[in-house]
Regions:
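Chalcogenol-based redox active-site neighborhoods
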Residues: 1-157
Length: 157
């Protein structure tokens, strides 16, 4: 799929939460949404990133953080419980062709092929993409500060 673009409407998607119910982006209409996308919770950088992000994002008003990976909902649920992550919503893309197609974040080759690349996307209250950072190197953290800053200012636009 093609990568989403800033200034455009974020495509709706269906992702699966830990109770196996589907969640749509449109369910969060009127809120700012930060998509924290990563290959798997079982890679060390991802665990760190989710933890750090959880802490910071919880301070933002009217903002939801969706942590999206190909991990099964059961694993995500277990991870969040173990880590005490209460303020992020873990969502699985394991059966979400629309997310994979419309966001263009699936890794195309190499050992991580088929998993989602590491990226942070900020969507404003009107559903417009305001910030995208695709991290080329799997072991690197995204620039969370930039994303949080963008999310914080997204209301004024």
């Amino acid at each position: 799929g093609k990568m989403v673009k800033t200034g455009r409407k974020a495509p709706d998607f269906h992702l699966t939460q830990s109770d196996l119910q589907d969640v749509k982006l449109s369910d969060f209409k009127g809120k700012k949404v930060i998509l924290n996308v990563f290959p798997s919770l079982d890679t060390p950088t991802c665990a760190v990133s989710v933890r750090e992000f959880n802490e910071k994002a919880s301070g933002l008003e009217n903002t939801v953080v969706l942590c999206i990976s190909m991990d099964l909902p059961f694993a995500q649920s277990r991870f969040c419980t173990t880590e005490g992550l209460t303020r992020v919503i873990p969502l699985s893309a394991f059966r979400s062709q629309d997310f994979i197609q419309n966001y263009g974040l699936q890794i195309a080759d190499g050992p991580m092929k088929g998993l989602l690349a590491r990226a942070v996307i900020v969507v404003d209250k009107k559903g417009i993409v305001r910030h995208i950072q695709l991290v080329k190197e799997i072991s690197q953290e995204p620039d969370y500060e930039a994303a949080l800053e963008r999310a914080a200012t997204a209301t004024t636009e």
